[in-house]
Amino acid sequence: MALRPAKIDRYVDKPAYTRREYIRGAPGPKITIFDMGNPAGDFEFEVSLHTAEPVQIRQNALEAARQQVNRYLQKNVGRSNYHFKIRVYPFQVLRENPMATGRKADRYGNGMRRPFGKPIGLAARLKKDQKILSIRVNRQHLKFAIEGARRAAMKFPCKCYYRIYDKEGNDVTTKILSQSL
């Protein structure tokens, strides 16, 4: 069965569906690596990507963003000069009621009889202004971290924005962007 468009699953309009002990055939997570780069490193800045609206992000989009950002940072910054962390986990089980189509579909399809649906994937459920991912770097690699966050935002079905924090956790976005990188 083909992958449905992300716009179908992005809205947070249904109750949470996460209890795996009650769900038969729930798929496993596609994203398995959440920390990349050098987690023990001491870095000056953290670039975090936030959501601008409540949204569900499918695990396919999270994995695509993870691969894109990690590859970009490894190529331009080097493996030991950054720490990249995915901050959300796909708990929400997505389901679909498969509808029969084609010739004589009415003979073998069930239509809306027992329409609860079968599990087809997982999604992370996020609130407004929640962090999706964080990239910790030093000042000389800050522009690569910002570009990585921008590339990750393209993979998600919502509006995103980034913030730059210093070591103490203070928001220094306007201060840094007013200076030249």
UniProtKB/Swiss-Prot annotation:
A GO CC annotation given for this chain: ribosome
InterPro entries to which the protein is assigned, alphabetical: Ribosomal_uL16, Ribosomal_uL16_arc, Ribosomal_uL16_CS_euk_arc, Ribosomal_uL16_dom, Ribosomal_uL16_euk_arch, Ribosomal_uL16_sf
Listed Pfam families: Ribosomal_L16
Disulphide bonds in the chain: none
Keywords annotated in UniProt: Ribonucleoprotein, Ribosomal protein
Record GO terms (molecular function): structural constituent of ribosome
CDD domains referenced in this protein's UniProt entry, alphabetically: Ribosomal_L16_L10e (cd01433)
A Gene Ontology biological process term: translation
Family the UniProt entry places it in: Belongs to the universal ribosomal protein uL16 family.
Subunit structure: Part of the 50S ribosomal subunit.
PANTHER family tied to this protein: 60S RIBOSOMAL PROTEIN L10
Protein name: Large ribosomal subunit protein uL16
Organism for this UniProt entry: Pyrococcus furiosus (strain ATCC 43587 / DSM 3638 / JCM 8422 / Vc1)
Lineage: Archaea, Methanobacteriati, Methanobacteriota, Thermococci, Thermococcales
Gene this chain is encoded by: rpl10e
